[in-house]
Amino acid sequence: MKRICICGGGNLGHVVAGFLAANGCEVTLLTRHPERWSHTLHITTPEGTTLEGQLSTISSTASDVVPQADMLLLAQPGFAIRSVLSELRDVLRPGIPVGSIVSSTGFFFEAMSLLPSTTPLFGFQRVPFIARTEVYGHSAHLLGYKSSLNLAVERASRDDGNRIASEIQQLFHCPTHLLASHYEASLTNSNPLLHTSRLYDLWHNWQEGITYESIPEFYSNWTDNASSLLIAMDAEFMQLLDKLQVTPGAIPTILDYYESTDAPSLTHKLQSIAAFKGIMSPMEKVGTTYIPDFHSRYFTEDFPYGLAIIHRLIHEHNIPAPHIDQVYDWGMNLISRYSD
């Protein structure tokens, strides 16, 4: 039986822990809130079934759950990655692979600076599931699967990298392909561009005093303006990949990934994805109206820990990126003013 330690209890932490436990793994959980968790997780699937997974140990202390693990898998927001890696490195057995479900918020950069060089590292290019928590610590919804997974592995031989990819394929019941370098997972045009372009489209004219009568759906109400901005940011991102000599095609363009040809067709595609239905824009209620929620992970994660990495590398390589600059500066300014 594979022993997996999940570090983190967000949407993906719930679903991945429940899915793996329901499929024969011994799952332990490292979370800041162990008192809120049940040892039994219920995960609904798109097929209408409910998976039941039993967690063996739940703790806020790394030494309780890390030493016995055969593999560690982080499901952490970007701001927490460094502190979690610092905590687990002292109790991690030599040679045990450490991975991250989300790779685009600095995991590889932090792990390579903090963990021993003998620790294999791996990370997903895109998350394996679309996930939403229902009752924290008890139940969640698995809303969508990927048809295949791409995995980056560092600090491992080619054979060991293939072995880790094979293990992930077995664990997630999904074809898994090995990427050429961690850049192909660390850098992505998924959330850091997808979310931030839409946020800019929604609220680039927002200022204090402006409120809204309702909350728009994030994807179902997607606009051509958001698509045009996303395509422009993606073109700048592709210049960075070329400069870094990332394997051509390893990270598909936004248009290729979503099987689109232009802004209107991209809008139609994003509006029509079933797993995206019902995902609302991040807003908070003020009286009877709404304002943008600057404490949402769409702001606190995707700007300072997602787009920031792309923005930094673009400037280090002297690549003109006016659209990325515009969106990044706008988002970071709002976060600095309103997310404290």
Where in this protein do the model-derived segments appear?
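Nucleotide donor/acceptor-binding cores
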Residues: 2, 147-149
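Short, well-ordered alpha-helix to beta-strand connector turns
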Residues: 24, 55-56, 69, 95
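Short, surface-exposed amphipathic charged segments that create phosphate/polyanion-binding patches used
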Residues: 134-143, 189-197
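Short acidic low-complexity segments
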Residues: 54-68, 177
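NAD(P)-dependent Rossmann-like dehydrogenase/reductase catalytic/cofactor-binding core
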Residues: 211-214, 220, 227-340
